[in-house]
A protein has these predicted regions:
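Class I S-adenosylmethionine-dependent transferase superfamily signal
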Residues: 117, 179-180
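Helix-to-beta-strand junctions that scaffold the AdoMet/dcAdoMet cofactor pocket
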Residues: 169-170, 183-185
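A short, conserved alpha-helix within the catalytic core of class I
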Residues: 169-178
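Conserved beta-strand signature within the Rossmann-like core of class I S-adenosyl-L-methionine
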Residues: 186-194
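A conserved beta-strand element that flanks and buttresses the S-adenosyl-L-methionine
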Residues: 161
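Catalytic core segments in nucleotide and nucleic-acid processing enzymes
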Residues: 150, 181, 188-189
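Hydrophobic adenine-recognition pocket in adenosine-nucleotide-binding enzymes
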Residues: 165
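Conserved N-terminal segment of class I S-adenosyl-L-methionine
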Residues: 1-157, 200-277
Length: 278
């Protein structure tokens, strides 16, 4: 039988339940170690199907899915996957250049990016907000003095970061609005989404945002700024307004019935032009 300490330290194994250890062991034996990226996506679809999750119904099945050890696998995987590491390094380098004093990674998962930022900027307060924090992730964060997990946002931040978060929630604009109200005026919201069907937990009713996300946030009061890796920075301009953003969402969803069949190089500018007229 494979020894999990080949991939996970004994100290961290002690923080993983025997049931979850057995599940991880099955995955590592199945793939001869860590799966490849596309294989991880496929493995993450398995409990979604087993639990019979419905992307239109946010019930206990969804809660069970996000508590499944597949998310521990995901967290461990991205900590050693070279492309994922390089993406986080580039995000970190951009954050460092902005010189924030208080940063929060919202939906930060395993907290890898937060730890990178904390190590690079030891005088900066870095928080991680994660509804399902794993003890292994919290233990790793505990090794970086200025990084800590918190149950919710509090006060005002110079920067909020959300990578691969909003494609998982039924009303992402509401969540952006609520979180961005903790962003100081002139502060930056770094967002990277994947509104594409690479995994079943990416809600298909949100795929229209592939062409309209920036516009929706702009009318909310978050001005699109520079592109950062596969995401974009948005700067808070003043008071935020949710209703205009939801109106953009309504029109975007209607346009998607047609634009989803067009190449992105056509669908995106067409959507932008039509939304400007609405």
């Amino acid at each position: 039988m494979t020894d999990l300490t080949k991939w996970i330290s004994a100290d961290e194994l002690a923080l993983i339940t025997p049931v979850d250890q057995q599940w991880l062991l099955g995955v590592f034996e199945r793939f001869g170690g860590y799966p490849e990226l596309e294989q991880v996506w496929a493995v993450m679809d398995e409990p979604w199907r087993e639990l019979r999750c419905d992307p239109e119904v946010m019930d206990q099945r969804i809660g069970a899915y996000y508590s499944h050890p597949v998310w521990l696998l995901n967290g461990l995987f991205i900590e050693q996957h070279q492309q994922s590491i390089e993406n986080r390094e580039r995000f970190r380098d951009w954050v460092v250049k902005q010189k924030p004093k208080r940063v929060v990674e919202f939906g930060g998962g395993f907290g890898g990016l937060a730890r990178m930022i904390g190590d690079a900027m030891p005088s900066v307060e870095v928080e991680v907000i994660e509804p399902h924090p794993h003890p292994v992730a919290m233990a790793r964060a505990g090794k970086t003095r200025n990084v800590r997990y918190q149950p919710e946002l509090s006060g005002e931040y110079d920067m909020i970061i959300a990578t691969d978060v909003f494609e998982h929630v039924p009303d992402p604009l509401q969540l952006v609005f609520e979180t961005a109200n903790h962003l100081r005026r002139g502060g930056q919201y770094l967002i990277a989404n994947c509104f594409s069907p690479v995994m079943r937990c990416h809600l298909p009713q949100l795929f229209h945002f592939r062409h309209s996300w920036d516009h929706a946030l702009n009318v909310m009061g978050l001005r699109p700024a520079e592109q950062v890796v596969y995401g974009r920075a948005f700067q808070r301009q003043g008071s935020l307004q949710l209703a205009p953003a939801h109106q953009v969402e309504k029109h975007s969803r209607a346009l998607w019935h047609v634009t989803q069949y067009l190449p992105g190089r056509v669908g995106r500018p067409l959507t932008k032009a039509l939304l400007a007229l609405s």
